[in-house]
């Protein structure tokens, strides 16, 4: 389980313990990708070579996706083997796997990725904007302007460029699912990570704007907090302090399997909303009327 309520936790966000009565830190039967059927569907995931992105790629393979493209700057030779193995273990047909060298901050690189996916797959049903960077800790006066702006380049400009390039393909599909991996940090005020927190809050708003423009056309845009997972962005499990080990307790699999669960069927009413993967998904789905009628899980000004 996540840290008990009351544990000193600078990453505790609104609703962490209150939206659903049950919370999780690892995958669980209700979101098992083996229960999904994404045969015939095509998926594109940025930052797909390692960490959360790698887990997402493998989860979609287990869910039977027929076409999976992963965009990253690093080599994906081993990932291709892992995709085939994951599909075989799940007794699914091996997907066509397309590794794409990608820089999400470069418009031409992103456009080339969209062209490659259309050329190789002829379709794209799900896009996951997962690529992200943390940036250095430090106060505003100690930050390097170029490094500060680079964080926004990856975490905000990247999802914008990818969304813009892939929207025409997504809108031709039936599922039309767009996932932005944001963070609980969007809701927090920890001054030593101003670029990261600014980028993630802006990404929440961008998710709502995409929904406002394309929701009526069937696009479902999710803003997903992937949990506090000790991935490479945090220096891995060995890079955590003893206190941080009490906080960074989520697995990559809960993030990956939750995203597969959310995108495996149309959930239009969740469009433009913030979702924490530690929340119990069946319980969240059962709250549909309350969430829609109260216009909940969105960034807004309340007075």
UniProtKB/Swiss-Prot annotation:
Q: How is it used?
A: As colorants, MonAzPs are widely used in various food products for centuries. Moreover, MonAzPs also possess wide-ranging biological activities such as antibacterial activity, preventing hypertension, lowering cholesterol levels, causing hypolipidemic effects, and displaying antiobesity and antitumor activities.
Q: What EC number(s) does its UniProt record assign?
A: 1.1.1.-
What highest taxon heads this organism's lineage? Eukaryota
- Residues recorded as binding NADP(+), renumbered to this chain, are 45, 103, 130, 164, 196, 200, 231
Q: Which InterPro entries match?
A: NAD(P)-bd_dom_sf, SDR_fam
**Database matches in Gene3D superfamilies:** NAD(P)-binding Rossmann-like Domain
> Which residues form each disulfide bond in the chain?
none
Swiss-Prot/TrEMBL induction comment: Expression seems not to be regulated by the azaphilone pigments (MonAzPs) gene cluster-specific transcription regulator pigB.
Catalytic center residues:
196 (proton donor), 200 (lowers pka of active site tyr)
Q: Which family does it belong to?
A: Belongs to the short-chain dehydrogenases/reductases (SDR) family.
Record's protein name? Short chain dehydrogenase pigC
Question: Whose protein is this, by species?
Answer: Monascus ruber (Mold)
Q: Which gene encodes it?
A: pigC
């Amino acid at each position: 389980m996540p840290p008990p309520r009351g544990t000193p936790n600078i990453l505790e966000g609104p609703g962490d313990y209150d939206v659903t009565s049950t919370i999780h830190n690892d995958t669980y039967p209700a979101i098992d990708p083996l229960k999904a059927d994404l045969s015939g569907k095509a998926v594109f995931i940025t930052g797909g070579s390692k960490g959360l992105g790698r887990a997402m790629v493998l989860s979609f393979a287990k869910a039977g996706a027929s076409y999976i493209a992963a965009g990253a700057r690093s080599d994906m030779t081993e990932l291709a083997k892992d995709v085939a193995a994951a599909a075989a273990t799940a007794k699914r047909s091996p997907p066509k796997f397309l590794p794409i060298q990608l820089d999400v901050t470069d418009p031409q690189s992103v456009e080339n990725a969209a062209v490659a996916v259309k050329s190789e797959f002829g379709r794209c049903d799900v896009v996951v904007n997962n690529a992200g960077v943390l940036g250095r800790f430090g106060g505003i006066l100690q930050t390097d302007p170029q490094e500060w702006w680079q964080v926004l380049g990856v975490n905000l400009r990247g999802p914008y460029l990818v969304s813009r390039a892939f929207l025409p393909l997504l809108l031709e599909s039936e599922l039309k699912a767009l996932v932005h991996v944001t963070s609980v940090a969007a809701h927090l005020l920890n001054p030593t990570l101003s670029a990261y927190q600014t980028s993630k809050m802006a990404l929440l708003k961008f998710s709502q704007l995409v929904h406002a423009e394309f929701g009526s056309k069937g696009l479902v845009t999710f803003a997903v907090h992937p949990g506090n997972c000790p991935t490479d962005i945090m220096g891995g499990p060995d890079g955590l302090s003893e206190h941080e080990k009490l906080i960074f307790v989520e697995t990559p699999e809960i993030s990956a399997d939750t995203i597969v669960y959310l995108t495996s069927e149309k959930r239009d009413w969740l469009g433009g909303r913030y979702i924490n993967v530690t929340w119990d998904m069946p319980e969240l789905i059962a709250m549909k009327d309350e969430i829609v009628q109260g216009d909940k899980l969105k960034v807004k000004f309340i007075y």
